[in-house]
Amino acid sequence: TRCRSPSPAARTTCAAMSRQDAELIKQMNMNAVRSHYPPDEHFLDMCDSLGLVYLDELAGWQNCYDSQVGARLAGEMVRRDVNHPSIIIWCNGNEGGWNYSTDSLFAKHDHLQKRHVIHPWADFDDLDTHHYPAYLTGVARFTNGYKVFMPTEFMHAMYDQGGGAGLRDFWDRWLTNPLFAGGFVWVFCDEAPKRTDKNNVLDSDKSNAPDGVVGPRREKEGSFYAIREQWSPIQLKPFFITDHFDGSFKVTNEYTYTSLSACTMTYRVLSLGTPMQNGGQASEIAKGAVALPDIAPGETGTARFTLPENFREGDVLVLEAFDKEGKSICTWSRTISFARQYFDRKMAQTPATLELAEKATASNTDGTVTLKSGKVSVDFDANTGMIKTVRSAGTEIPFNNGPVAVGMKMRCEPSLSYVQNTPEGAVFCAKYKGAADSIVWRLTDRGLLYMDAVLLNRASGGGGFDDAFMDTKVYNLGLTFSYPETACKGMKWMGRGPYRVWKNRIAGTNYNIWHKDYNNTITGESYDNLIYPEFKGYHANMYWATIESDTAPFTVYSRCDGIFYRIFTPQEPEGRARGRRTMPAFPEGDISFLLDIPAIQSFKPIEQQGPNSQPGNIRIKSGDEGLRINLMFDFRK
C-alpha cells in the first residue's frame, strides 16, 4: 500500500518522485499497488508504463461520504482514471468507510470494463479482502473457503515489525489454495513530514505513521530486501553445497506469464579472508553464466553451471537472476564450506600471523583460574566459570561476565572442574549441571583462546535441578557476555548481512564480508540521523566478527554452523504506543552467541503468526550428542 508521501521537506509530489516510488516497488518484486485515495495522475502514468497494477480507491475510513458527496467524488475519480490500463479494481472506502449506495456508480462511469468493486477489509461480492489475518484465519474462508481472497492490508510494518518478517509463512499457506489472488503489505514508506513549527523535525506522529518498508527519504529497511527475496519470480529450492555439489540446483518459475528462458542468471565465486589472513578482504576468483531451464510459470526445473577449477578454493557462491530486460531480480548466496572447514582451512593458510609466544600456562590461585600466553591473559572465576578479566599487551579488554546461559539454566560445579597444562595449550574445563555439560577454555601458545561448549546432551542435566533447566518456549538460546557499548566504534564480520535479522526475517541477507560503523538507529524514529543498516541486533550465520575499538578490539571466530551473533540491544522507540515493547526481549549482556533467536511480530502477537515465527522447544533423548557452541577469540594486539 502506498499513500501519497512527498519527500519530508516538500508538501507536494512530482512525476520524478512517482517514478522513484514505482521503481522501488518493482525492486521489491511487487506488481500491485493500493492507496487510500485516488493517486496523482503521474503515479498512474508510471504504473501504466512500468507494469504495476493498481487498486483505485474512493477515500473513506470507518466513516463514509454521504450519498450526495460520495456520488460526485466517485464519478470524478472514475471519469478521471478510467482509461488507465493499470487499474484493475475500484475500491469503495476502507475499513468500513463505504456507502453501499455508491457501489453501482462505478459501473455507470466505467461502462465498458465494469471493473470489480471491493470494500477493503470486507468479504464482499465474492472477494474476501480481510485485513491483518492471523496465520490460522480461515474458518470457512481464506484457505478453507470457496471465494477468491486477497487481504488488502497485511504484514503491518510499524517500526521494524512486519513487512518481510513472517511473510513466507503466510504466503506459502495461502498459495495452497488456487483462489488466492494476492495481498498488500502495509505500508510503502514512513510518513514523516518536516515540521517547520517544531524546529524542522521529521514527525511521524509517534507510532501512528512509522509503518514503512522504506523511510521518509526512501531509506531501505531490512524488510525491503526480505520482501524482494521472498517475492522474487524466480525461487531457488533450498540446497547446501557439499562435496557432491555439481553445479546444479532446482529453480521454480513464479512468473505469471514469462518463461524462464527469457531470464538470465550469473554466478560468482568469492574468496573471503580472515582478519589474521589479509585483514578480512573479499575477492572474486571466478564468475560465469548459469543455464536456466526453459520452464513455464508454475514449473520447477534444474539450473546448472560448470564448476570452475578453483571452485573449492572459494568460500561463497553468489547467484544473481535478471529479468528479460536485464534488470536484477534477486541475489542469493551459499557458503561453499561449513564453518569448521572454513576455519581450519584459513588457519592453515595463516602461519605467518601465528608466531609462537611463550608457553601457555594455566593456574588456579585463590579461586581465580588464569590462562596466560605471552601478552594475553584471561582470568576466570573458578566457582562460576565466568570470565573476570582479559588483558592483552597490558591493556584490559572489557569482555567479561560470561558465559551466562540464555534460555536455559546451568550451574558451575567447581569440584568437577579442572585446570590442566597440555601440549595443545593451557586448559580450564568448567563442568556444569543443568543445560551445560562442560565448557572447555584453551589458550594456545600463540595467544588464541578457544571455547568449546557442550549443551543439552543430558536429559537429567546431571541432576541437581528440581525444575526444568531450559525454557519451555525458547526465544533465545545460547551464551552471553558483557562488553561496553561505549568502547565500540564499528564491526566487520563474515556471515549474513548487512542487515540484522529476526527468526522470521533472515531472507534478504547474504553471505559476504560486511562492515558497519556503530550507530544507534531506532528503526522508524531516528529521522535526524537515520542510518541503515542498523548496527545493533542479531546477525545470522556468523563465521567471524571483529569488534572495532580504539582501546579494546578483538575478533571472534565460529567453529560451528548456525551461530546468531547478537551485538548490543536496540533501543525501543520513544514514541511507541502506551510504552509497549515493539521488539522481543534481548538476552542480558551485550554480546551473545546464540543457537536460536526470537521472531518479531506484525500487528498481532507472535502466537497469531506462522510456524516459523513461533518459539522453539527442546527435547533431549538418551544418546543425544547435544549442541555445540565452539568459538575462538583473538585478543592479541
Task: Show the residue positions of the predicted features.
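Terminal connector regions
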Residues: P308-A348
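Beta-strand/loop-rich accessory regions of lumenal/periplasmic or secreted enzymes
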Residues: N310-R312, F343-K637
